[in-house]
C-alpha cells in the first residue's frame, strides 16, 4: 500500500506565529498536530508513509519523519528548519533518520535557510529571475511548464549569508529578546492581520537590524 501525506503551507496569521515559535521552542502546536495526524492514520496504512509539503508543509513533513515511527520517506520543498532546542532533544533520532529526508529548494529561496536544517540531502534548483524576491518562494518555481524539475543548481550566496545571520540570532541573542524579535518579524510578514502591535513589530525590526549590522562587520570574507 503506497500512502502519501501532503501538508499545506502557511495559511493565516496563527500559522505565521507558529512558524516563529518553531524557531525558538522545542516544538510548536502545528508541528505536534501534524504528528498527531500521522499517528491517527489507520494501521493498515503501515509504517512506510511518504510525506511531503511546501514551506511550513515541508517543515511539518520533516518533523513527523523524526518524531513518529510511520514515515519511510520525506520529500520537502523549501521547508524551513528547526530550533536549537529541537535539534538537541532529537539529536540521535535526526542522525539516524536524516537520510530519509530530501529538501528541494529554489536556489534563491529564503525560507529553507531559516533555523537549523535537518535534511540529509538539500537539492537546489535553478529558477528564472524574479523582480520581486518574495516570488522565489513560489512552490511551482522549481518546475517547468510541463511539470518536470528544472535543472539543478547551487544555493545562492546571499541565502547562505541569510542563514548565517539567522543562526546568529538563534545562537547568541538572549531571551526574551530572541523570541520577541522572531515574533515581531513574523508579524511583519503577516501584515495587517498580525496580532503583534505596530510598536512591537518596529522594535523587533530595529533590534534585528542592530544584530544584522554587528554580524556584517564580522564577515571578514567581505570586509577583510
Predicted regions and their residues:
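Alpha/beta hydrolase fold serine-hydrolase catalytic domain that processes acyl esters and thioesters
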Residues: 1-3, 7-48, 68-224
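Gly/Ala-rich beta-loop-alpha elbow adjacent to hydrolase catalytic centers
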Residues: 52-57, 61
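Short glycine-enriched nucleophile-adjacent loop
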Residues: 61-67
Amino acid at each position: 500500500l503506497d500512502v502519501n501525506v501532503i501538508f499545506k503551507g502557511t495559511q493565516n496569521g496563527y500559522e505565521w506565529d507558529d512558524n516563529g515559535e518553531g524557531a525558538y521552542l522545542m516544538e510548536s502546536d502545528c508541528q505536534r498536530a501534524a504528528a498527531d495526524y500521522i499517528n491517527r492514520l489507520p494501521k493498515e496504512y503501515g509504517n512506510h508513509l511518504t510525506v511531503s509539503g511546501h514551506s511550513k508543509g515541508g517543515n511539518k513533513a520533516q518533523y513527523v519523519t523524526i518524531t513518529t515511527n510511520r514515515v519511510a520517506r520525506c520529500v520537502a520543498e523549501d521547508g524551513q528548519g528547526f530550533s536549537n532546542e529541537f535539534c538537541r532533544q532529537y539529536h540521535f533520532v535526526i542522525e539516524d533518520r536524516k537520510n530519509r529526508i530530501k529538501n528541494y529548494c529554489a536556489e534563491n529561496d529564503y525560507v529553507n535557510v531559516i533555523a537549523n536544517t535537518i535534511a540529509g540531502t538539500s537539492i537546489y534548483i535553478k529558477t528564472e529571475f524574479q523582480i520581486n524576491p518574495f516570488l522565489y518562494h513560489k512552490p511551482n518555481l522549481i518546475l517547468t511548464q510541463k511539470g518536470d524539475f528544472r535543472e539543478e543548481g547551487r544555493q545562492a550566496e546571499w541565502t547562505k549569508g541569510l542563514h548565517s545571520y539567522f543562526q546568529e540570532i538563534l545562537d547568541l541573542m538572549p531571551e526574551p529578546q530572541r523570541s520577541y524579535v522572531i515574533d515581531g518579524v513574523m508579524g511583519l510578514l503577516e501584515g495587517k492581520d498580525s496580532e503583534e502591535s505596530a510598536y512591537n513589530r518596529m522594535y523587533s525590526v530595529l533590534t534585528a537590524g542592530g544584530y544584522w549590522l554587528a554580524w556584517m562587520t564580522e564577515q571578514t570574507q567581505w570586509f577583510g
